[in-house]
Amino acid sequence: MNNTDNLIDKNPSKSNNKITGELVNYQNESYYKISNSHAMRPFFMSIVSDSNHWMFLSSNGGLTAGRKNADFSIFPYYTDDKITELAETTGCKSIFRIQKNGKNYLWEPFSERQAGLFTIKRNLYKNIYGNKIVFEEINEDLNLTFKYQWNSSDEFGFVRKATLINNSEKDLGISILDGLQNILPYGVGSDIQGIRSNLVDAYKKCELETDSGLGIYALSAIIVDKAEPSEALKANSVWSLGLDNPTYLLSALQLNDFRRGLELKQEVDIKAEKGAYFVNATINLASSQEKNWIQVANVNQTVSDITRISEMIKRNDHLEDTLSKSVEQGTKKLIDLVASSDGLQLSNDELINTRHFSNTLFNIMRGGIFDDNYTIGKEDFITYLSKANKKLFLNIKAPLQNLPNEFTLEFIKDLADKDADKDFKRLCLEYLPLKFSRRHGDPSRPWNKFS
């Protein structure tokens, strides 16, 4: 393919790049839209969930994400400046070869590699609940729109929904290469990734289960400086739906081959390279039609977890519907959590309503909420005692097992009154049955380690 075919003489006026912000209805949900976000300096965002997902993104597409804390990452956890700078090599990457009017065009949305080559417009959408974000690029020269959405599912992990729309009056032949790059294997903590990333690369092992198209990202062994066995028994995983019979890539080694128009070879087993998950397929996109596909990434997966997902993909038991329902269930749970702390309000100003929801959400993420009328769970209470006073816990460990699975605040007060140990009394009265709280911190504040 001749890359000079891409050179379309355009000189967009500055008026086309006016930055605006407004609330819009998108896919039956309220989103705040920033038009022409590419005309702004990159800024940092966070995406929340009702569960233990965390995701920090730059407006240029760079991101880090994982579950629980920075040691369970699917993309490297760095400071925000590095995340912004590594947008070309970490996270989402999409490249399209388009046949139009007898010519071939190469389009790489959201990439600075093609800055000034096409007349484009980039928009950002974030839903009012803060758990979904959409990146959109409109190519006015090729009359194409590409967008992708990040959201999450407690059961399945991180969900990326990609959409390619043909805005022209002609059918287009399009070769797609789309996916994720710089995927971490399980067992790589943020500390070792930050200072010994080349050593981590040497231990990486990426495998494809060809029947289901599921990518498995693991270490050949857990990296330890001890003379002892250290098997890596878990992995991170990525899988996809929506494209028929795609070619799968597990690294970024063939990206330039695709840019040059060369045929790609499926990768099944890649060692000592940064992990990636790309799907390659050729489609015919009719005028005014769109093509959708999905990629799902998760961390901390056991052999049984991976086997279960693989079987679900092969059976294809309405998996896309199951995935969508899981995502929407997460949104409903998030709303319920905020509602429990009076985070829902209705006024004449939708932006004020959204601001109040957001403020309440981040307050309860910091401080937590009292769930189910202050009901206390035995396991959480026992864990609390074991960490608060280890010596005391060893003495009362056996009697604690006789507690009911759930009990009330009055029950724990009565328990404290009947016990002669002053430390136990104090710990009972100090215990707070909070949920949803987490230690704060993010890539812009690296001195704080969140959890």
Predicted regions and their residues:
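Anionic coordination/interaction segments
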Residues: 1-451
